[in-house]
């Protein structure tokens, strides 16, 4: 059994770690609330433009944009959104696991995959496991801006425009609630038709001013950018929620460990006192 002094040192060490994890839990909770506000502010725009684009995909368009046309799938692209920091449980691991499973399905069909990575965790992961990485961006912090995402998005859109990609997806964690974050893979291009039954029952048609091509070129590009940005914001909210839960679990586990060490310490101290009393009694008997 370890000595009483050694056990006291371990207890002090765990208590110090517990203070750190508690502070990190509080910081994550504060950041999560701010990120949730940002997510709530951007979500109406993302959902509205997704709805409009869904109508377009179902409509009888005067001009058929390339982003609306299905192609034979030979190459697919993924915009992968991860975190820049760790200590957020299995958030990134679950996302990468889902992505690798889908990439394997494509590989079995002889379809090649290209990756544009957002976040240092995705960069380090695919540096170790391998992958055709064509773009990456890291260090966006807690206040990501669309301008920081334009680089990877433009690279993937250019590849799609030039026919080097036949499908484009965004991979991110969807924020459900504080305790639940769901890894999702959403198709961006070709434009998926709206899945709302009420939309499918209607015949959507549009008049474009001044020119359908110019309008759709801008609108569809903004659609892709908005969905990627919304994915980044939701992933950030998921990160802070997962980190808050992970740090709370670490703090609670620290408390349990302290109780166990305190019990061991009490037993060690009791054994030491018993031994001293035995030695005193033995010495007195010898006299």
Curated annotation (Swiss-Prot):
Name of this chain's protein: ATP synthase gamma chain
Membrane topology of this protein: Peripheral membrane protein
Described function: Produces ATP from ADP in the presence of a proton gradient across the membrane. The gamma chain is believed to be important in regulating ATPase activity and the flow of protons through the CF(0) complex.
Organism: Photorhabdus laumondii subsp. laumondii (strain DSM 15139 / CIP 105565 / TT01) (Photorhabdus luminescens subsp. laumondii)
Subcellular location(s) per record: Cell inner membrane
InterPro entries cross-referenced by the UniProt entry: ATP_synth_F1_ATPase_gsu, ATP_synth_F1_gsu, ATP_synth_F1_gsu_CS
Subunit structure: F-type ATPases have 2 components, CF(1) - the catalytic core - and CF(0) - the membrane proton channel. CF(1) has five subunits: alpha(3), beta(3), gamma(1), delta(1), epsilon(1). CF(0) has three main subunits: a, b and c.
Keyword entries, A-Z: ATP synthesis, Cell inner membrane, Cell membrane, CF(1), Hydrogen ion transport, Ion transport, Membrane, Transport
A GO biological process held by the record: proton motive force-driven plasma membrane ATP synthesis
GO cellular component: plasma membrane; proton-transporting ATP synthase complex
One Gene Ontology MF term: ATP binding
Pfam families documented for this protein: ATP-synt
Entry similarity comment: Belongs to the ATPase gamma chain family.
């Amino acid at each position: 059994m370890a000595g009483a002094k050694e056990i006291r040192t371990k207890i002090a060490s765990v208590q110090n770690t517990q203070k750190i994890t508690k502070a990190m839990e509080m910081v994550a909770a504060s950041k999560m609330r701010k990120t949730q506000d940002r997510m709530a502010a951007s979500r109406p725009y993302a959902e509205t433009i997704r709805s409009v684009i869904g109508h377009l995909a179902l409509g009888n368009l005067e001009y058929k944009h390339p982003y609306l046309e299905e192609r034979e799938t030979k190459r697919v692209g993924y915009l992968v959104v991860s975190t820049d920091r760790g200590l957020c449980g299995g958030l990134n691991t679950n996302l990468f696991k889902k992505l690798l499973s889908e990439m394997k399905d494509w590989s079995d069909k002889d379809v090649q995959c290209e990756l544009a990575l957002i976040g240092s965790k995705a960069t380090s992961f695919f540096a170790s496991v391998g992958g055709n990485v064509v773009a990456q961006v890291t260090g966006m912090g807690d206040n990501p801006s669309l301008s920081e995402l334009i680089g990877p998005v433009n690279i993937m859109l250019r590849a799609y425009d030039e026919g080097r990609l036949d499908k484009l997806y965004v991979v991110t964690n969807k924020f459900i609630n504080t305790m639940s974050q769901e890894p999702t893979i959403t198709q961006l291009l070709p434009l998926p038709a709206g899945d709302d039954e009420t939309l499918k029952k209607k015949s959507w048609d549009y008049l474009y001013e001044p020119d359908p091509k110019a309008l759709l070129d801008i609108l569809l590009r903004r659609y892709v950018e908005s969905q990627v940005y919304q994915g980044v914001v939701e992933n950030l909210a998921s990160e802070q929620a997962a980190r808050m839960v992970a740090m709370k679990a670490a703090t609670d586990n620290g408390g349990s460990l302290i109780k166990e060490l305190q019990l061991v310490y009490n037993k060690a101290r009791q054994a030491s006192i018993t031994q001293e009393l035995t030695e005193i009694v033995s010495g007195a008997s010898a006299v």
